[in-house]
Design a protein with these regions (language model features):
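A short pocket-lining beta-strand/turn micro-motif at the edge of beta-sheets
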Residues: 89, 100, 132-134
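Extracytoplasmic segments of membrane-associated envelope/inner-membrane machinery
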Residues: 11-88, 94, 101-102
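A sequence-composition feature that detects small, non-aromatic residues
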Residues: 2, 39-41, 50, 88, ...
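A short interface-forming secondary-structure element
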Residues: 98-108
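Amphipathic heptad-repeat alpha-helical coiled-coil "stalk/arm" segments that mediate oligomerization
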Residues: 1-22, 85, 135-144, 148
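Extracytoplasmic/luminal low-complexity segments enriched in Pro/Gly and acidic/polar residues
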Residues: 107-168
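Short, basic/low-complexity N-terminal boundary segments at the transition from targeting/disordered tails
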Residues: 3-6, 61-65, 76, 115, ...
């Protein structure tokens, strides 16, 4: 806006990224309206990460309703670390909790799928054990399908140091 005194007033509204995308085009962010924002390797924003197979029929923008749901719920935003897109109907959520992945299916009926997941996390995993299942699936309507782990998880690479070894 130009003022009478010859000055120009510029109003800038920064775009706020809500998702980091890694695909064949490289890495970039998108905001809530789906606009692409360049990513700079010098800076990092703590937003959900999506990677996988995107094309003209299923773009990262199609994930925005899912990202919005995750982003507005403190439990899910703390739990979900990555969204992996195999196909438009085979979306995998990778939780911070090691040991299993979540087959979310497509981006339809998001609230219902998260209600079923909440049931699993509150009622089933505390009883069966956090490493009992390999995959938790809410892909199909009205169902929770859990795939039992065939093998145990690899032991974490942690060496316990006996402090008595260092005594003189």
């Amino acid at each position: 806006v130009a003022l009478n005194n010859g000055h120009v007033v510029i109003t800038v509204k920064p775009m706020k990224p809500v998702l980091r995308v890694f695909n064949n085009d490289g890495s970039y962010y998108i905001n809530r309206s789906g606009k692409r924002i360049s990513a700079d390797a010098r800076y990092y924003l703590d937003v959900p990460v999506a990677c996988g197979n995107f094309d003209s029929t299923f773009t990262p923008q199609h994930l925005l309703p899912l990202v919005d749901y995750i982003y507005t719920d403190s439990v899910w935003s703390s739990l979900v670390s990555m969204i992996k897109v195999n196909t438009a109907t085979n979306i995998i959520l990778v939780p911070m909790i090691r040991g299993h992945v979540i087959n979310f299916g497509d981006v339809e009926n998001i609230e219902n799928k998260f209600l079923r997941l909440r049931h699993i996390y509150r009622n089933i995993l505390p009883v069966k054990g956090w490493n009992y299942y390999d995959t938790l699936s809410v892909k199909w309507a009205g169902q929770i399908v859990a795939t039992k782990r065939k093998k145990g998880l690899a032991a974490p690479v942690v060496k316990i140091i006996d402090e008595s070894e260092f005594e003189a």
